[in-house]
């Protein structure tokens, strides 16, 4: 009994130490009012912004000395409107260049902190890298990463996806040089942590729906899919694109009928694509794991199976406050298309789709889900 009590006390001490350690972490999200104010501060402190401001000194002298105001005005307008664009471009390139020079240290921090796909696990990595980059004069302020999600996204776009897409060792060495062994070690640590998370979803079934027999799919509530879609685009996510579509209708009133039909059809198609992309963008890695686990563990096959998966995921995403109601998927066909388009198709092509993630850490589980679908269709 005493030994058990001592073990429990030790485990509590370890947990409390970790909690205290996490409380000590200070990131820019704790210091700035929003990511926008942090971004403005970053721009203000950048060299490109200072150069842009200094350009106004010779321009003001030119205005005083010149007898013809047209040329100074033209140059001033160019500097005024194009200057901020160049400042932003140079700022982005500077961030990318600074981080690319510190890949080895990035990997060391990942190996030491052992983060998983949970964004909170990346807080320590983000804080340590912020300090390291500033102290080693790789960045001019202490706030390189705004929060843990920014650090995780940088890992994904800088290390995880580019490295995973390299086909052979020579290509990896050519792109990442001496950082290759450190990257391999960091990715190994990350994949092990992701696998632990996956086991919680797939083996222990951490979530199970209650009262699902009363749940209805949107196809049972709406007569047409178009009415469901129009209701969806009325939310805040699609308000600006929808207003843009109405503006396009007004602008195209002078076109001939054929051109107007083609133009508005293309705009509507882009609007639908935007809506489809938003659905996958708001899903975290946890939600994607639950989706794949639900597919793998579904007992029914065919259309009924996908309808059941759609019901479960509609309930799950509503309970997790990802979606405002239980209408994320219209029906089983929509659910199957979603899996095929945003998961299996990306895996097959191994090429990112615009701003969408490759989901590299989910590749083994996507294959498993696709295999279970194939087995069900053959059964």
Curated annotation (Swiss-Prot):
Entry keyword set: Membrane, Transmembrane, Transmembrane helix
Transmembrane segments: 43-63, 70-90, 233-253, 255-275
Keyword Transport included in the entry's annotation: no
Superkingdom to which the source organism belongs: Eukaryota
One of the record's GO cellular component terms: fungal-type vacuole
Major localization class: membrane
Compartment annotation: Membrane
Annotated GO biological process: protein transport to vacuole involved in ubiquitin-dependent protein catabolic process via the multivesicular body sorting pathway
Membrane topology per record: Multi-pass membrane protein
Record carries keyword DNA repair: no
Family to which the UniProt record says this protein belongs: Belongs to the DUP/COS family.
Designated name of the protein: Protein COS4
Organism whose genome encodes this protein: Saccharomyces cerevisiae (strain ATCC 204508 / S288c) (Baker's yeast)
């Amino acid at each position: 009994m005493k030994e058990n009590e001592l073990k429990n006390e030790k485990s509590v001490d370890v947990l409390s130490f970790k909690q205290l350690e996490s409380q000590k972490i200070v990131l820019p999200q704790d210091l700035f009012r929003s990511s926008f104010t942090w971004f403005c501060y970053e721009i203000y402190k950048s060299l490109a912004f200072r150069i842009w401001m200094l350009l106004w000194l010779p321009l003001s002298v030119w205005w005083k000395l010149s007898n013809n105001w047209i040329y100074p005005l033209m140059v001033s307008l160019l500097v005024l409107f194009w200057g901020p664009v160049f400042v932003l471009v140079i700022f982005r390139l500077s961030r990318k260049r600074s981080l690319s020079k510190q890949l080895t240290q990035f990997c060391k921090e990942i190996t030491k902190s052992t983060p998983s796909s949970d964004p909170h696990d990346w807080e320590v990595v983000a804080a340590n890298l912020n300090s390291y980059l500033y102290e080693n004069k790789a960045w001019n302020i202490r706030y390189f990463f705004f929060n843990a999600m920014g650090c995780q996204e940088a890992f994904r776009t800088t290390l995880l996806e580019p490295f995973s897409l390299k086909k052979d060792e020579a290509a990896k060495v050519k792109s990442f040089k001496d950082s290759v062994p450190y990257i391999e070690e960091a990715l190994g640590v990350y994949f092990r942590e992701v696998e632990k998370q996956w086991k919680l979803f797939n083996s222990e079934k951490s979530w199970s729906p209650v009262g699902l027999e009363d749940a209805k799919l949107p196809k049972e509530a709406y007569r047409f899919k178009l009415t469901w879609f129009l209701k969806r685009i009325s939310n805040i996510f699609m308000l600006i694109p929808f207003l843009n579509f109405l503006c396009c209708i007004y602008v195209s009133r002078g076109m001939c009928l054929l051109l107007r039909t083609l133009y508005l059809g293309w705009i509507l198609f882009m609007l639908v694509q935007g809506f489809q992309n938003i659905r996958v963008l708001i899903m975290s890695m946890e939600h994607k794991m639950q989706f794949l686990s639900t597919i793998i563990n579904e007992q029914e096959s065919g259309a009924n199976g996908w309808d059941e998966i759609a019901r479960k995921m509609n309930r799950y995403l509503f309970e997790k406050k990802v979606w405002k109601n239980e209408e994320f998927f219209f029906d089983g066909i929509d659910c199957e298309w979603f899996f095929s388009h945003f998961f299996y198709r990306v895996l097959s092509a191994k090429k990112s789709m615009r701003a969408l993630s490759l989901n590299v850490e989910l590749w083994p589980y996507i294959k498993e889900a696709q295999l279970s679908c194939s087995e069900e269709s053959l059964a």
